[in-house]
Amino acid sequence: MMHSVSRLARRFCATLATATAEISGEAAASVPTKAKKHRSIYKKLSSLGTRGGGKMEETLNQFVMEGVPVKKHDLIRYAKDLRKFRQPQRALEIFEWMERKEIAFTGSDHAIRLNLIAKSKGLEAAETYFNSLDDSIKNQSTYGSLLNCYCVEKEEVKAKAHFENMVDLNHVSNSLPFNNLMAMYMGLGQPEKVPALVVAMKEKSITPCDITYSMWIQSCGSLKDLDGVEKVLDEMKAEGEGIFSWNTFANLAAIYIKVGLYGKAEEALKSLENNMNPDVRDCYHFLINLYTGIANASEVYRVWDLLKKRYPNVNNSSYLTMLRALSKLDDIDGVKKVFAEWESTCWTYDMRMANVAISSYLKQNMYEEAEAVFNGAMKKCKGQFSKARQLLMMHLLKNDQADLALKHFEAAVLDQDKNWTWSSELISSFFLHFEEAKDVDGAEEFCKTLTKWSPLSSETYTLLMKTYLAAGKACPDMKKRLEEQGILVDEEQECLLSKICP
């Protein structure tokens, strides 16, 4: 075993050593071939996040044994892409594999890894990793990465202390740390603290970047300070047109939409389109969402057509954006058409698309069509179906079809989808039906189904007792049931118990 590991390590090192000799001989067809290989490798690595996809270490080792070029800068890129598409654990496994191969990390590499640790293992693990780094490795990138972690988790006290430490160490030389703090305060619902950070930036002779200006504008919008918005725009104009980005105009449009200034919103959206990079999908998504916000269906379709011309192979993210937009516009014919188009072209069946279609049909009281989408989805993918089932159940309960809703609930339990958690709204809706029908037996049967999943909560027992009270029936053993579950009886439950459990 030790010999095979040594051979693997030597082969990996040899692969790295040939980095500069990649494009030669039969690779003269080169760039397209190389790009195709990269796509193939990334596709394999990203599939590891799916059920039965395999393990990262085994896959990377196999690449090395097969002579597939596995270079550090490519691995870093794959890790960044996995992070972008919300697979931080898989991305972290790439770094862990590189560490086992004794590949040296720069400060920037450590910064990325720290971020991935926070995303996949939590903030405490990220702090431990940061503290384990040698002082010679800790630089502006690593300090900045930890600050970002604090800000994302809205740990204001830690973020402020860490930021002051960065200032003392001369690790604050650009707008990024300030932008992180601004984003944190916006997330904390404290937009009034953003302007002071802009002042602090300027006192340090740091020029605001386009992101800074965008968040400053956002903060003014949150405070409904339209004069403040105009002042920021005037300052940006003084800086020069180059400081304006599509994101600036997206924020402007969102602010104007929120206060009902649709004319100004339209102007901002036109500026967004003129300033955006046509190769960035998110720009089209923002346009679609914002035009939806002003109920401009014709512009939504126009941007959708632009996106499809730019990207003939439309991905799931774009289809999801369009379907959600059409659903908000109550364009059921559009939803039907786009959903059918997606189903006919998709590589992987994404239940989010089906959920939007189901929700759209139910809004129009078209239960049969919604159920047809659900049944079709069950044949085409392995789930998860919890969201779809809840949508159907809520609709059935609102339309006095509790028997059908219960069948869906029982089916969900039989599916044994361990990731499913029902909403409190759904449980309350079921019990509202039992209470109005004075159906104690039905409520108890429902509780039995619930306990197949997990013990009943205190809130569920309250709803059950209300059903007994509505039915005018006693439940002599209710106190004992609560005690056995270790539930601390609150004032409302004491009152209910006094009436149903004398």
Swiss-Prot record:
Disulfide bridge partners, by residue number: none
Main location class: mitochondrion
Per-repeat ranges for PPR: 139-173, 174-208, 209-243, 245-275, 280-310, 315-345, 350-381
NCBIfam families: PPR
Native species: Arabidopsis thaliana
Transit peptide: 1-13
Name the record gives this protein: Pentatricopeptide repeat-containing protein At4g01990, mitochondrial
Matching Pfam families: PPR (PF01535)
InterPro entries: Pentatricopeptide_rpt, TPR-like_helical_dom_sf
Domain of life: Eukaryota
Assigned protein family: Belongs to the PPR family. P subfamily.
Localization, UniProt: Mitochondrion
